[in-house]
Regions:
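Eukaryotic basic, amphipathic alpha-helical target segments in cytosolic regions
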Residues: 34-36, 55, 61, 65, ...
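Hydrophobic beta-strand residues in large extracellular and virion-surface proteins
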Residues: 63, 93-97, 132, 156, ...
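Conserved small/polar residues in nucleotide/adenosyl-binding loops
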Residues: 222-227
Length: 232
């Protein structure tokens, strides 16, 4: 790894150790504290998993880095550390239910503190929503997989007499659209209807909803406060 300093008491940080092959990195958490009792003149250096996944769902899941690699199985109510990542990894992971023909979710960030929602495919339910809660405690980032028992993140309601097509994109301008954005998942909202919705790409830094109605188009930038409420 890069040189580490043990001088700062209370230091909590991540440590990256390259593999011998050079294509993977081991991620650990480092915690430095004063010793207690007979160790009071010493500094206690603790190494812990940097990323710890806790599956609070009632069924086993597989988790894998979105850049590729072998999936890791996590049983119901089991905690499993994720140690190895690709070099220059964006720390995006994806999930699949065990025995679900490995239909993977959209990538999500295990580095961004907060909550995101993912759609998973289950045999008895085509749209199964789960919550991913990412929190940091000491040098470890805890990623909890939780059943989503409340309302969906968004409810889109079309109170007009026109059919509305909407989709998520990562940019508001045609010139900046990615290859994914040129063929996005599209949803049709019939007149006087409503639809539950969760982001198709929750790992995107910028989240836009592109609306199409009667040949007109408008992009709305979503923020945690509010989106622009003037669609056309």
């Amino acid at each position: 790894s890069k040189p580490l300093s043990f001088d700062v008491i209370g230091s909590e940080e991540g440590v990256v150790i390259p593999s011998s092959s050079g294509d993977r990195e081991l991620h650990l958490g480092l915690d430095i504290q004063d010793g207690l009792s007979k160790f009071k003149l010493s500094k206690v250096v603790k190494l812990a998993p940097r990323y710890l996944i806790h599956n609070k769902l009632s069924h086993a899941v597989l988790i894998a880095e979105s850049m590729g690699g072998d999936p890791v199985r996590i049983g119901a109510d089991e905690r499993v550390p994720l140690h190895w990542f690709h070099v220059a990894s964006n720390k995006h992971a994806t999930l699949a239910l065990e025995g679900s023909n490995l239909e993977w979710t959209a990538p999500f960030s295990i580095d961004n503190i907060g909550n995101v929602y993912l759609r998973m495919v289950r045999d008895d339910e085509p749209q199964h929503l789960i919550q991913v809660d990412v929190q940091i405690q000491g040098p470890t980032i805890f990623v909890r997989l939780l059943p989503s028992e409340g309302a969906w993140p968004f409810l889109l309601r079309n109170e007009t007499h026109h059919t509305i097509v909407f989709m998520q994109t990562g940019s508001s301008t045609e010139a900046q659209l990615s290859s994914r954005d040129t063929n996005p998942k599209r949803y049709v909202l019939k007149p006087r209807s409503k639809m539950k919705y969760a982001w198709d790409y929750p790992a995107d830094a910028d989240k836009y909803i592109r609306l199409q109605i009667n040949g007109s188009e408008r992009c709305l930038l979503y923020t945690s406060d509010a989106a622009d409420d003037t669609p056309f």
